[in-house]
Amino acid sequence: MNGGPSGFNNAPVTKAFVIATALFTVFFGIRGGSSKLGLSYQDIFEKFRIWKLIISAFAFSSTTQLLSGLYLLYFFRVFERQIGSNKYSVFIFFSGFVSLILETILLSLTKDPTANLLTSGPYALVFASFVPFFLDIPVTKRFGVLGVHFSDKSFIYLAGVQLLLSSWKRSIFTGICGIIAGSLYRLNIFGIRKAKFPEFMASLFSRFSLPSLSSHSQPPRRTSPNLGRQAVRAYRAPMPSTTEPSEEAIATLVSMGFDQNAARQALVHARNDVNAATNILLEAHSH
């Protein structure tokens, strides 16, 4: 398992979000106000500080949270490559909106105007992303340390646990809200997984994209030596496609942790349809 090609190739929305998170965190950290960015009952129900609602969705309250959060946001760019920048923008908006509603309900139940009950930072996006990470990203390597079994996904989970517990109850509450938001997106409530923003809005992020990286600079990933053959047996197209899979499609599947050769074979049988090829590989991996 890996995050795919290094950098933000084919992930301009993630790049914009990471930059905004870093800038807001550093700016308010220098001014000494980062610890006061967490939402409270007073912020929403008494003074209605709109600016704080926005800033709290980006700025972390500590350097430790920033490092863990940026690491996870950077890794989760794999999902933008998988579903496209437009739908990923919808995922970000939906996760943030649902999390804000849940946090507002939580604050309304406490009614404590003096305490910042919720910590600040993009917890909604980070922990909503753990839902597809848990369900869709396959384990490609297992190993043991002192009798304890780990996988290549364990480091991501450990970073998530560290971030979840970084401010104790304040961060646990926001993290749980993010997981619930990600679960609702996964359940396709209101058909949200098919929703898209107008193209002119999504294209605003294109200016943040980095120069594309050559796909053949990526070393082959190994999952299982028989995964490619399993993928072919798992799906038989009536008319084998003679179209060579695009390098971009192969890179997308490789970025999800699949072996390069298996990805190529799956794309051939799926007629270069990334979603269908993903299903083929996941089905083969489950056998």
UniProtKB/Swiss-Prot annotation:
UBA domain residues are: 244-284
Q: Which Gene Ontology terms cover its molecular function?
A: serine-type endopeptidase activity
Output a single Gene Ontology CC term carried by this record. membrane
Q: Which InterPro entries match?
A: Peptidase_S54_rhomboid_dom, Rhomboid-like_sf, UBA, UBA-like_sf
Task: Tell me which domain of life the UniProt entry assigns to the organism this sequence originates from.
Answer: Eukaryota
Instruction: Quote the SUPFAM superfamilies the UniProt record gives.
Output: Rhomboid-like, UBA-like
Main localization, broad class: membrane
Which spans are transmembrane here? 10-30, 53-73, 90-110, 117-137, 145-165, 172-192
UniProt keyword list: Membrane, Transmembrane, Transmembrane helix
Where's it found, cell-wise?
Membrane
The family database entries (Pfam families) matched by this protein are listed as: Rhomboid, UBA
User: What's a GO biological-process term for it?
Assistant: heat acclimation
The family note in this entry says: Belongs to the peptidase S54 family.
PANTHER family recorded: RHOMBOID-RELATED PROTEIN (PTHR43066), UBIQUITIN-ASSOCIATED DOMAIN-CONTAINING PROTEIN 2 (PTHR43066:SF21)
Q: Which purpose does this protein serve, as stated in its record?
A: Probable rhomboid-type serine protease that catalyzes intramembrane proteolysis.
Would you tell me the protein name for this molecule?
A: Rhomboid-like protein 18
Q: What is the lineage of its organism?
A: Eukaryota, Viridiplantae, Streptophyta, Embryophyta, Tracheophyta
